[in-house]
């Protein structure tokens, strides 16, 4: 429990320290507790800590107070706090160098299911994209019914993927860009509630964290990292789904994309990615 509390405290030092920096520091020191217990004498657990780093760590007492409040909130709302040493922590994600030091999770899905795919794409999906998801998830259900479907609970492709997974009795997890004290967008609240008993909600952000734009980009690495493969359904030429595909490639994961009409802006990103051999074609 102490290492969990200390891990939460370290994340309270963001944005001064990035997730990658936090993981690197923990590896160097041994674990989160070593850093927290020696926050005012970092040279005892780290090789040549900079003055800037020492200054950041001077706020550790306040970070610990906030971490205790967060842990109380999680206990009150049945939220699991997962750190990399926990068996329930997504092991695929754990192998990524910039994995989150802490994850907050509500749900009943196994985050280490034998098969996990993410389904991603534009927020402005077309009827074509919706039909692709509908048929694709039916096919996945027939071939591998225990596959866990991951997406981001956003408008468009994301929510369509979640709802079709639920409709087919498949578990689905939404990775959020904010704390578990809210649902964004609010109109997806009922779907999110249903997912708690047939999948779950996952985030690296504590309560009171708002869905800022930068958080969505950070969220994408979790979507990519916890999955075996990324499935891009529709994307504009510079769509956010392409970011997730790029991260997946960097992690050594498979990337697939559905081709679309050459006249459709919603398929331009998919077609370009396939043409550049950045994704395997799904037909």
Give residue ranges: language-model regions.
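Glycine-biased, small-residue-rich flexible motifs in mid-sequence functional cores and linkers
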Residues: 1-4, 83-283
């Amino acid at each position: 429990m102490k290492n969990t509390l200390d891990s939460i405290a370290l994340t309270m030092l963001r944005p001064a320290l990035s997730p990658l920096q936090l993981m690197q520091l923990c590896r160097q020191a041994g674990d989160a507790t070593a850093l927290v217990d020696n926050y005012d004498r970092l040279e005892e657990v780290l090789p040549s800590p900079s003055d800037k780093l020492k200054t950041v760590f001077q706020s550790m007492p306040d970070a610990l107070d906030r971490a205790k409040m967060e842990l109380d909130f999680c206990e009150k709302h049945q939220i699991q706090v997962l750190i990399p040493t926990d068996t329930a922590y997504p092991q695929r994600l754990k192998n990524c160098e910039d994995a989150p030091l802490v994850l907050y999770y509500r749900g009943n899905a196994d985050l280490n299911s034998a098969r996990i795919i993410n389904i991603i794409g534009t927020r402005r999906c077309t009827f074509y994209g919706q039909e692709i998801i509908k048929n694709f998830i039916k096919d996945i259900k027939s071939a591998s019914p225990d596959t866990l479907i991951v997406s981001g609970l956003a408008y468009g492709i994301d929510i369509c993927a979640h709802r079709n997974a639920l409709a087919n009795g498949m578990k689905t997890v939404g990775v959020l860009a904010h704390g578990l004290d809210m649902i964004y967008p609010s109109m997806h609240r009922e779907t999110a509630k249903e997912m708690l008993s047939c999948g779950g909600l996952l985030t690296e952000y504590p309560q009171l964290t708002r869905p800022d734009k930068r958080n969505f980009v950070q969220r994408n690495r979790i979507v990519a990292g916890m999955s075996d493969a990324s499935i891009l359904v529709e994307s504009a030429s510079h769509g956010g789904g392409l970011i997730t595909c790029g991260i997946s490639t960097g992690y050594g994961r498979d990337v697939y994309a559905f081709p679309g009409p050459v006249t459709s802006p919603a398929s331009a990103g998919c077609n370009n990615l396939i043409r550049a051999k950045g994704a395997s074609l799904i037909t």
